[in-house]
């Protein structure tokens, strides 16, 4: 069931659950964007196609807030905002673990390489060509 956190004429923010995908991929699973379109179509009795822009995504294995643009103008403005403030925006991931870590505080750094054929990313301990650095602090 779709959990709408906020909506107005320009944007709609929803809670993405773990394992939901934001946009269609080769898995064929129904993306959150289609669920939001169906919600808007039904709630506002919209005929035809519903416009919905996707200015950002949240990875499939995690939950979080996703903001969708309800108009092309809102999408343009959100894209510009995300681009201009890229260095100020950060993602914070909270993890639930079965056992306490050995240390109370540590910083872990890994290097992520995406495999587009399998639609997965792999983490490495050492830098690799084309890898993106990922840091975890706890």
Residue ranges and their predicted role:
Residues 1-138:
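RNA pseudouridine synthases
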């Amino acid at each position: 069931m779709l959990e709408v956190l906020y909506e107005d004429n320009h944007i709609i923010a929803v809670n993405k659950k773990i394992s939901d995908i934001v946009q269609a991929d080769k898995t064929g699973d129904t993306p959150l964007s289609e669920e939001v379109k169906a919600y808007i179509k039904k709630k506002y009795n919209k005929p035809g196609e519903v416009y919905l822009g996707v200015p950002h995504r949240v990875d499939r294995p995690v939950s979080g807030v996703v903001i969708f643009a309800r108009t092309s103008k809102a999408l343009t403005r959100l894209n510009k905002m995300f681009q201009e403030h890229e260095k100020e925006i950060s993602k914070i991931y909270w993890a639930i673990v079965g056992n306490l870590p050995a240390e109370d505080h540590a910083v872990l750094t890994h290097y992520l390489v995406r495999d587009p054929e399998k639609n997965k990313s792999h983490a490495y301990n050492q830098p690799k060509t084309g890898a993106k650095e990922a840091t975890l602090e706890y």
